[in-house]
């Protein structure tokens, strides 16, 4: 695993070094058929990371949000697989907010090899094999896709946040800054895979489509409903507030 940990660190450095070029493309916006934004920064960063990985991982099967085609392979195969969302939370990003992230998950066949979450403008990252500083919270984070379950969850009381970035939510539920993260409408593999694998590594309770998640590959051709709870009982001296 050690060489791959080094590779993930190098990807983080690659993104950090590219940040000025990414930010320079922030407000060059186009609109997808579903009405969501995509910026030149999304395209630039996906192309940069894909090229860098292809030079280092032989016969790589690359799955990226901005380049994935519906006719492409959707099941894991022998060899290296990379699943990337170059800028998760594009609406935040192109609005000038700093709560956006990079999500990368690497697999060898059906076996997870390592994952990385980055919050580049906030200067933070989380990756496979690295320790995390755990905190505690009573906040539930919700996805920004409006769904009746979100409205009822907020109406039922308690602290709730809609933060507009799956990477930010996944990063924070893994370390305990969110007690729970819920996306009842569903998100794509590139939005979720790195984050759910890191949450799995750190002992969170994870439900995908209503079933316990055991760390399997998520196909890129469909959406997944996710519910993650931080396990405060697994680290001493911590517990949910309230």
PLM features: what roles do these ranges have?
Residues 1-87:
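N-terminal subdomain of lithium-sensitive/metallo-dependent phosphomonoesterases centered on the IMPase/IPPase/PAP
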Residues 65, 118, 184:
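Conserved residues at the C-terminal ends of beta-strands
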Residues 135-242:
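An extended, acidic
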Residues 43, 66, 86-89, 120, ...:
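Generic detector of well-ordered alpha-helical packing
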Residues 75-129:
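DPxDG-like acidic metal-binding loop motif
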